């Protein structure tokens, strides 16, 4: 199925005009949505629990309230807290204060699609999911363009949910560069699969395996790091700019030939079957339930995974090498300023 890219000219209704907007959470996505919408002339308040996020939102000039207070004041409520805390936050502080005709939005379909959150039938449910981290959503908006976004409607109680979703996307700058309509199911399952099988899980496992093969064969860890990790950015940037074609036009004939003959030896049909199993665990809710249950138990699995990852040899080698490369990691510092 193909989808049509839409732009500012396609946003026909200023559905947020006259609406009080509450952004719930002031982290990576929260600060970007709130600031961009405010700069687009929208009436935005922040709902967040006391702490660093609360203080940061006030410092940035927002009227800042508890989540309960913000929900009571708002017509449109965008929930941008971390996925794992949204259910308890919604049930305790948002749901009791919703009114018929309100709209509730998300930047990821996780809690709605897997039914951890169930919104009353007389409330709209929409999505605006920028395809980039919050600091990039904010920076590109300030530069006069934006980050593309997906939008979706899960529940249209008022007949205006799609207009709200599209106008929200316009307000954060996404419609400047392109919007794609999707569904909660499609966005959620594809996003999780991309993260797990390719972008995060698949990529880090591939890099680590390559590093281990080289070092176990007696090659210097520092050189192995450069070959399998440091140069990754150069290749990904080429693919990002012009697809596989530009990357292959930019590398040597030797590298291109090796790409064709050895890539399929690494990513075999068995690997593809493993990817299908990952997708199945996403589709049937196993991953979602495991993740949420781990959070409710105090994150024992996630904590153990983090400790194990921090002790990888490639991480230790990389940390030392990057000390000699001050130009690495100096951009986009705001990516790490997550206000909890």
Curated annotation (Swiss-Prot):
Q: How is the cofactor bound?
A: Binds 2 magnesium ions per subunit.
Domain KARI N-terminal Rossmann positions: 3-182
Going by the UniProt record, its keywords in alphabetical order are: Amino-acid biosynthesis, Branched-chain amino acid biosynthesis, Magnesium, Metal-binding, NADP, Oxidoreductase
State whether keyword Oxidoreductase applies.
yes
> One biological-process term from Gene Ontology?
isoleucine biosynthetic process
The chain positions of domain KARI C-terminal knotted read: 183-328
Physiological role: Involved in the biosynthesis of branched-chain amino acids (BCAA). Catalyzes an alkyl-migration followed by a ketol-acid reduction of (S)-2-acetolactate (S2AL) to yield (R)-2,3-dihydroxy-isovalerate. In the isomerase reaction, S2AL is rearranged via a Mg-dependent methyl migration to produce 3-hydroxy-3-methyl-2-ketobutyrate (HMKB). In the reductase reaction, this 2-ketoacid undergoes a metal-dependent reduction by NADPH to yield (R)-2,3-dihydroxy-isovalerate.
Q: Which PANTHER family match?
A: KETOL-ACID REDUCTOISOMERASE, MITOCHONDRIAL
Q: What protein does this entry describe?
A: Ketol-acid reductoisomerase (NADP(+))
Q: What is the lineage of its organism?
A: Bacteria, Bacillati, Bacillota, Bacilli, Lactobacillales
């Amino acid at each position: 199925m193909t989808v049509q890219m839409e732009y500012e000219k396609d946003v026909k209704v200023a559905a947020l005009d006259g609406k009080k907007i509450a952004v719930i959470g002031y982290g990576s996505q929260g600060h970007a949505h709130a600031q961009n919408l405010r700069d687009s002339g929208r009436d935005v308040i922040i709902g967040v629990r006391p702490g660093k996020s609360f203080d940061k939102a006030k410092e940035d000039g927002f009227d800042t309230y508890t989540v309960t207070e913000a929900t009571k004041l708002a017509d449109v409520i965008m929930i941008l807290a971390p996925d794992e805390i949204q259910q308890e936050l919604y049930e305790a502080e948002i749901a009791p204060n919703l009114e018929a005709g309100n709209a509730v939005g998300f930047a990821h379909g996780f809690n709605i699609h897997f039914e951890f959150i169930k919104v009353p039938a007389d409330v709209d449910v929409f999505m605006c999911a920028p395809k980039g981290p919050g600091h990039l959503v904010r920076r590109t908006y300030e530069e006069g363009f934006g980050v593309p976004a997906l939008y979706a409607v899960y529940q249209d109680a008022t007949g205006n949910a799609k207009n709200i979703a599209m106008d929200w996307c316009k307000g954060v700058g996404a419609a400047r560069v392109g919007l794609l309509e999707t569904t909660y199911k499609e966005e959620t399952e594809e996003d999780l699969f991309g993260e797990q099988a390719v972008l995060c899980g698949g990529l880090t496992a591939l890099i680590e395996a390559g590093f281990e093969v080289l070092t176990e064969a007696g090659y210097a860890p520092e050189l192995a790091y450069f070959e399998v990790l440091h140069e990754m950015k150069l290749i990904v940037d080429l693919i990002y700019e012009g697809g596989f074609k530009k990357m292959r036009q930019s590398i040597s004939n030797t590298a291109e030939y090796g790409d064709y003959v050895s890539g399929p030896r690494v990513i075999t049909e068995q690997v593809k079957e493993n990817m299908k199993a990952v997708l199945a665990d996403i589709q049937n809710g196993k991953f979602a339930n495991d993740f949420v249950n781990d959070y409710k138990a105090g994150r024992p699995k996630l904590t153990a995974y983090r400790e194990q990852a921090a002790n990888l040899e490639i991480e230790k080698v990389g940390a030392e090498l990057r000390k000699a490369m001050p130009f690495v990691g100096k951009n986009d510092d705001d990516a790490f300023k997550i206000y909890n």
